[in-house]
Amino acid sequence: LLRRRRGLLDGVVLTGGEALRQDALADAAREVIDMGFQVGVHTAGPYPRRLRDMIEAGLVSWVGLDIKALPEHYGQVVGRANAAARAWESLEVLVEAAGRGGPDFEVRTTVVPGDVTADDAVEVARRVHAAGARVYALQQARSEGTSGEFDVVAPGWDGMCERMAERIEALGWDRFTYRPA
């Protein structure tokens, strides 16, 4: 399939539940690169060492990193011990690599109405910016493809998200994107 796409595509983004969890990711990235494509990775950052290894091996040219909440609220959002430390360490890995000419990256936060993600969004963006990231996206959660166990709409929610986006954009990013639902 990819061989037929040469000249039509610039790259392939490896994603899934968590791309970096896959033991064969580095080998898959090498194959994609050998076919002449760039490689991107979507991650929530639970494997900072594996991310560093991929970067140092030259196997990734772009990363989309989800930072879900402030460190003190991460467990509430993802329900896993050490998730905050690992995600924020992955951000450090990306910032350090970018300082050495490493891959481009985007940090994004997805917000859900009535959830700590919405309460934290502007402060998360401030801390991400202070850490050295320069490309950021605020995303409204969407119901498509979910179990329906949480509400992604609420009265006034769109307006709240637009105001969050304005405050976050004002932090001075090289590129800021707001992705409404």
Model regions: which residues?
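Conserved AdoMet/S-adenosylmethionine-binding subsite of the radical SAM
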Residues: 1-11, 20-153
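Short acidic, glycine/proline-enriched helix-loop-strand junctions
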Residues: 87, 100-105, 146-181
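Conserved strand-to-loop "acid loop" that flanks and positions the catalytic carboxylate
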Residues: 17
